Amino acid sequence: MREREPSLVYAFRQSTPYVNVHRGATFVLMMGGEALCHPNFANIVSDIALLQTLGIRLVLVFGSRPQNDEALARAGIEAQYHKRIRVTDDESFAIIKQVCGGLQYDITAQLSMGLANTPMQGARISVVSGNFVTAQPLGVDDGIDFCHSGRVRRIDVEGITRQLDQKSLVLISPIGCSVTGESFNLSSEEVARRVAVDLKADKLICFSSTQGVMDRHGEAISELFPEQAEELLVELEQAGEEMSGTARYLRAAIASCRGGVPRSHLVSYQDDGAMLQELFSRDGLGTQIVRESAEQARAATIEDIGGILDLIRPLEEEGILVRRSREQLEMEIDKFTIIERDGLIIGCAALYCFMEEAMAEMACVAIHPDYRNSNRGDQLVAKVAERAKRLGIRRLFVLTTRSIHWFRERGFDPLEVEDLPVARQRLYNWQRRSKVLSKTIV
């Protein structure tokens, strides 16, 4: 008898909102040469095919730094750099063009696979390459001639868009052509950044050896603003890691965000399925550089009632929260503050003011189970306290049966029922016997 796979069913259901959001979006994938020669690249190709199948418009920009270095070393040519940029003379460039051409054909071949009993079965991806990047020479700097090293001058947005409209995957190498008929060796990070910005892509996805940017404890930082990412970049440069994959990709991600790309992701090319988990789960796996946070604390609206009910119902059934009907929520929705993450309400609290006493009750405090070990509760208390201050409230109080110590740790002190506003004393449930705690907020 065939067995049911609940984990597969759960994964499909959880990913559905992201499938809908990403359909028709444009993603630029930036993949360095290290990723191309890693054993997991075959799995990444399968994941790229899946994204294509889901209706996502893809541009893949690849690099060839390690392959170039290896080929030059075999030829007995020592790589020359100036200000972290390769100096590409005639002899070196002839080899680099061969390397990039070979990689382009190899990637195209892998994306063209369609063997039965493989993830690529029936994929039929149309891969298009061309002169989509116009380059110009870097010229001479401090007396050093960069020769065939160049920079991006222009991206053929119309040409790329035309191919994406035909459901083709656009493959771009780090070699650009110029109006004079020459070609130049480019930084793949610069190419990917310019393509993402000029195309007004929805995402730039970078592949690194690490699972995002790591904190001091070795954990991936989930989200960074460009300013925070710049601080980490300075730390990497001070540690002598300015040429590391993480540093190179951080520069591209920061510039992309500031150029208008909403989100740039940094994921590992070593971990199977890292890109899919980053794109189709709420918390992802790597690091995203964002212009605006995927999570925000805000005032609730009538559209949030369903999400609030989903959040508080389990706590009501456990007796932790007092039961509220949908009708009551509709009447009191303007009193609620919520924390929303990618469309899911993960926290809520209500504020009931007693203006005569300059006191307010923070009630219906709830945090989604997946986020209770984070600082979301503190964010919620701070947001509600801030709202209370604006209304002229001097003292915030809570009634709780289970979370006494949690509130004590955050500066709330015990209060007698008799010290509550008179109107609230009349509503006190003596059978429930909730503990009362309060905190001065001004």
Curated annotation (Swiss-Prot):
GO terms for molecular function: L-glutamate N-acetyltransferase activity. Keywords: Acyltransferase, Amino-acid biosynthesis, Arginine biosynthesis, Cytoplasm, Transferase. GO terms for biological process: L-arginine biosynthetic process. Its EC number is 2.3.1.1. Residues 295-442 form the N-acetyltransferase domain. The keyword Protein transport does not apply. The keyword Amino-acid biosynthesis applies. It is an enzyme of class 2 (transferase). It is found in: Cytoplasm. SUPFAM superfamilies: Acyl-CoA N-acyltransferases (Nat), Carbamate kinase-like. Pathway: Amino-acid biosynthesis; L-arginine biosynthesis; N(2)-acetyl-L-ornithine from L-glutamate: step 1/4. GO terms for cellular component: cytoplasm. Belongs to the acetyltransferase family. ArgA subfamily. In bacteria which possess the bifunctional enzyme ornithine acetyltransferase/N-acetylglutamate synthase (ArgJ), ArgA fulfills an anaplerotic role. This is Amino-acid acetyltransferase.
